[in-house]
């Protein structure tokens, strides 16, 4: 499971070269290195599950989160391409794209901001880490053996 992540909200014109590189390194390069390390073992046993964690912003883009959105979109591209490449080896590759999940990444949000985000979500609540984990457990299991190259949104209907 490739789940490293950082977040930063700022205007695109204020993003430094270092911040851009760090965002891509953590989200995209981290997943690349993780997959590259795990794949030989999976290919050898002709079975494996690779799961990446992107974001709804990787699907639709987020204002003031251009670097984050670009890194997460790259992760979706990595997932889809790797699924096609490794399918013949018995390895599935899928992605979970969480929406607004109540994690440490939201620590700087006020209670009012969190309430407003919950209200925008069709299911009327913020997601939980357990809900994201449940989606990952499903995709890692035998029941998902014919699912590959997919992006599963865990976002309460915010992105459809």
Provide a role label for each language-model segment.
Residues 11-12, 19-24, 106, 113, ...:
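Substrate-binding pocket helix/loop in short-chain dehydrogenase/reductase
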Residues 40, 84-88, 145:
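Alpha-helical segment proximal to the catalytic Tyr-Lys
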Residues 55:
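Residue(s) in the substrate-gating loop at a strand-loop-helix junction
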